[in-house]
Curated annotation (Swiss-Prot):
Gene3D superfamilies: 3.30.70.330. The modification Phosphothreonine is found at residues 150, 679, 741. GO terms for molecular function: identical protein binding; miRNA binding; RNA binding; structural molecule activity; zinc ion binding. A zinc finger (Matrin-type) spans 801-832. This is Matrin-3. Residues 653-665 have a biased composition (Acidic residues). PANTHER family: MATRIN 3/NUCLEAR PROTEIN 220-RELATED.
């Protein structure tokens, strides 16, 4: 302000430069604009104010010419103190340039208001010749201007700038008048020197800073008198961003210099807002980042920041303002934006429409106000929802929406544990590719209690915070139409299968593994996969399974020198018998015999064969009745996928089959889809057939015409086929060098072969003795001798030496033909292969 008056004094003393505003670089209006950089109306106000100060002999005049302008500018502080003492502006320390410009503009406005003048008055005063304006006739000129303004009516009242001592109510000026003023300003400064600061069209700096300054001015009583304006002032004071949704330049400028501009923002409009406003109103996830909120003009750079923004109070208030500006627009009737709650993150990633049931009914203007929306996320404050959102509508939803979680093992268990303490879970839905989950509670109160709790307490999944709120789009999860009665039971069917990993490859029986789980409850079913060092044990109840998992989390489970990892299988929820009659009958039949089991007792070959005929893999002949019971249910064997689809009568019911994709969610919703865990993924080919199962379909097709005697020997053929499949699996693992990989490969691949060989000797020796006369000499093999190599013909040179029986490569011929061919695994596989050839030859003769 001091610089403005100093320049006015300079212009006063240099009469030759006073009227030529565009040519003189240090003229009256140009100098004021250079120091203030304000709109045209305030520039003319400063011009008139400077002229008033000069006429009233404020003690600032000095005889300076054009060359002395620089020294006059440096002495601005002295005259500034004089001005402050006269107009009681108060002494403030030196401010930054932008703050000083803004403060000087408002001080000039207050000075003019103290004289009862407006911007239009000063415009007319500036048109008077300077030689006709003297301190003597100035009061008469001002009175004449005021009388003329009174006669013309309120058209001269320009909001804050035109406020008189009587505090006339602000008048809404047509937009055309502002355009004229803008053009006048541009025309007045077209010839201005290039060194001067550029003129900004009606941009009065940051709205938040300007609003804070207005709150300190005497304009406060106007806002207190007018309730609506007070509410609008507080509304605009919360942010420093403008609207991009308005069409005209005047409306885009945000808050103007007074209540006039505030009221202009509430101008009613017809129709609906632009699509960008609608999308941001509904909280749709942006397609990319950074994203600019078209309602708040606020840039966001991530999903988390976007979620915090749309749940904040400032965004909510602007959504309410958008509804007031477009009274005819009903956001619930938008066909492309069916999100019911404009303040919640749009669940745009949900599967096909209608999966979770119809959205709740739309809310209308006639509903009663319900007060705070404190249960829909932090930052909402005490703001009422737009158009008085009914709390009853919130209560109708029973679906808890969980977002922003990270995937991991036992994801479903982790998610359900968040809400399980608050009530019964009736259904749930976990999306496959998107980190969103919906959990339906039995009652609305349970869902509301869970949401209220996590409003104040962070919800954690795998130790990372997640967002929990009540879904406003979906009231409940719809049951599938085809199987309404097959809905899973949370307590009895979900999560009953325990997954044991890092088991030893061999050296233990099935019963030894089962004894690990027996202390925690009754075992309903199990499957053991030695080649994959893992096992699945189904307990009778979920509580038993959870008890074992919880105990092993606190205290590590050690088995034969290995730390066994125990967790609840997320992949499989139960083990199902495809032929339940045989399996169940076998279980019931062996239960009574299990009690009378003696560790020293062994079964005769005939008894063991009756239980394991058709089994793909027999684990041990020394195991007791309990082992036989389980191996009869689900003997284990690695098979090819095509064979597994035909023959096994036991499978793991995988939740991976019920994964929710966006395209298939409608059909897969029944049992509460979840994301499978890769770590406990077990191929269906790992599941073996039942103990009393008939020969496999593949074997039956190959040997359909075999005689009864040949069918008795099918067990051996199956074992040989299993051997070949193991060889293929070993070959897939890559080429192995004899020095580095021979011991490990043979031991890992054939670790349980001694048991199988013993089993074979136990259950098949009598058959071999009976049928030895039918086996030609070329297919016979004597007893095993460690230092005598056999089957050397099967070791062939191929970039090394490859054993076709064991699927192993060797670079050294001596190691391959002597060391390897003298090994027990090689001998066992050769024996099985010769038995297979002999059986095929016999079948050909009989046919």
């Amino acid at each position: 302000m001091s610089k403005s008056f100093q320049q006015s004094s300079l212009s006063r003393d240099s009469q030759g430069h006073g009227r030529d505003l565009s040519a003189a670089g240090i003229g009256l209006l140009a100098a004021a604009t250079q120091s203030l950089s304000m709109p045209a109306s305030l520039g003319r106000m400063n011009q008139g104010t400077a002229r008033l100060a000069s006429l009233m002999n404020l003690g600032m005049s000095s005889s300076l010419n054009q060359q002395g302008a620089h020294s006059a500018l440096s002495s601005a502080s002295t005259s500034s103190h004089n001005l402050q003492s006269i107009f009681n502006i108060g002494s403030r320390g030196p401010l930054p340039l932008s703050s000083q410009h803004r403060g000087d503009a408002d001080q000039a406005s207050n000075i003019l208001a103290s004289f009862g003048l407006s911007a239009r008055d000063l415009d007319e005063l500036s048109r008077y010749p300077e030689d006709k304006i003297t301190p003597e006739n100035l009061p008469q000129i001002l009175l004449q201007l005021k009388r003329r303004r009174t006669e013309e009516g309120p058209t001269l009242s320009y909001g804050r700038d035109g406020r008189s001592a009587t505090r006339e109510p602000p008048y809404r000026v047509p937009r055309d008048d502002w355009e004229e003023k803008r053009h006048f300003r541009r025309d007045s400064f077209d010839d201005r020197g290039p060194s001067l600061n550029p003129v900004l069209d009606y941009d009065h700096g940051s709205r938040s800073q300007e609003s804070g300054y207005y709150d300190r001015m005497d304009y406060e009583d106007d806002r207190l008198r007018d309730g609506e304006r007070c509410r609008d002032d507080s509304f605009f004071g919360e942010t420093s961003h403008n609207y991009h949704k308005f069409d005209s330049e005047y409306e885009r400028m945000g808050r103007g210099p007074g209540p006039l501009q505030e009221r202009s923002l509430f101008e009613k409009k017809r129709g609906a807002p632009p699509s960008s406003n609608i999308e941001d109103f509904h909280g749709l996830l942006p397609k990319g980042y950074p994203h600019l909120c078209s309602i708040c003009d606020l840039p966001v750079h991530s999903n988390k920041e976007w979620s915090q923004h749309i749940n904040g109070a400032s965004h909510s208030r602007r959504c309410q303002l958008l509804l007031e500006i477009y009274p005819e627009w009903n956001p619930d009737n938008d066909t492309g934006h069916t999100m019911g709650d404009p303040f919640m993150l749009q669940q745009s990633t949900n599967p096909a429409p209608g999966i979770l049931g119809p959205p709740p009914p739309s809310f209308h203007l006639g509903g009663p106000a319900v007060g705070p929306r404190g249960n829909l996320g932090a930052g909402n404050g005490n703001l009422q929802g737009p158009r008085h959102m009914q709390k009853g509508r919130v209560e109708t939803s029973r679906v808890v929406h969980i977002m922003d979680f990270q995937r991991g093992k036992n994801l479903r268990y982790q998610l359900l544990q968040l809400v399980e303490p608050f009530g019964v879970i009736s259904n749930h839905l976990i999306l496959n590719k998107i980190n969103e989950a919906f959990i339906e509670m039995a009652t609305t109160e349970d869902a509301q209690a869970a949401v209220d709790y996590y409003t104040t307490t962070p919800a954690l999944v795998f130790g990372k915070p997640v967002r929990v709120h009540l879904s406003q789009k979906y009231k409940r999860i719809k049951k599938p139409e085809g199987k309404p009665d097959q809905k899973f039971d949370q307590k009895q069917e979900l999560g009953r299968v325990i997954h044991l990993s890092n088991l030893p490859h061999s050296g233990y029986s099935d019963s030894a593994v089962l004894k690990l789980a027996e202390p925690y409850g009754k075992i309903k079913n199990y499957i053991l996969m030695r080649m994959k060092s893992q096992a699945f044990i189904e307990m009778e109840t979920r509580e038993d399974a959870m008890a074992m998992v919880d105990h092993c989390l606190k205290k590590a489970l050690w088995f034969q020198g290995r730390c066994v990892k125990v967790d609840l299988s997320e992949k499989y929820k139960k083990l199902v018998l495809r032929i339940p009659n045989r399996g169940i009958d076998l279980l019931k039949k062996d239960k009574s015999r299990k009690r009378s089991y003696s560790p020293d007792g062994k079964e005769s070959p005939s008894d063991k064969k009756s239980k394991t005929d058709g089994s793909q893999k027999t684990e041990s002949s020394t195991e007791g009745k309990e082992q036989e019971e389980k191996s009869g249910e689900d003997g284990e064997k690695d098979t090819k996928d095509d064979q597994t689809e035909q023959e096994p009568n036991m499978l793991l019911e995988s939740e991976d089959e019920l994964l929710v994709d966006e395209e298939e969610a409608a059909a897969l919703l029944e049992s509460g889809s979840s994301v499978g865990d890769e770590t406990d993924l077990a191929n269906l080919g790992d599941v073996a057939s039942d103990g009393k199962k008939e020969p496999s379909d593949k074997a039956v097709k190959k040997d359909g015409s075999a005689s009864a005697a040949a069918k008795k020997k099918l067990k051996k053929v199956d074992k040989i086929e299993e051997l070949d499949q193991e060889n293929e699996a070993a070959l897939e693992n890559g080429i192995k060098n004899e020095e580095n990989t021979e011991p490990g490969a043979e031991s890992s691949e054939n670790a349980d072969d001694p048991n199988k060989d013993t089993s074979e000797n136990a259950d098949g020796q009598s058959d071999e003795n009976k049928d030895d006369y039918t086996i030609p000499d070329e297919y016979r093999i004597g007893p095993y001798q460690p230092n005598v190599p056999v089957g050397i013909d099967y070791v062939i040179p191929k970039t090394g030496f490859y054993c076709k029986l064991c699927s192993l490569f060797y670079t050294n011929e001596e190691v391959a033909k002597n060391t390897h061919c003298s090994s027990l695994p090689h001998y066992q596989k050769l024996k099985k292969f010769l038995n297979k050839l002999a059986e095929e030859r016999r079948q050909k003769k009989e046919t």
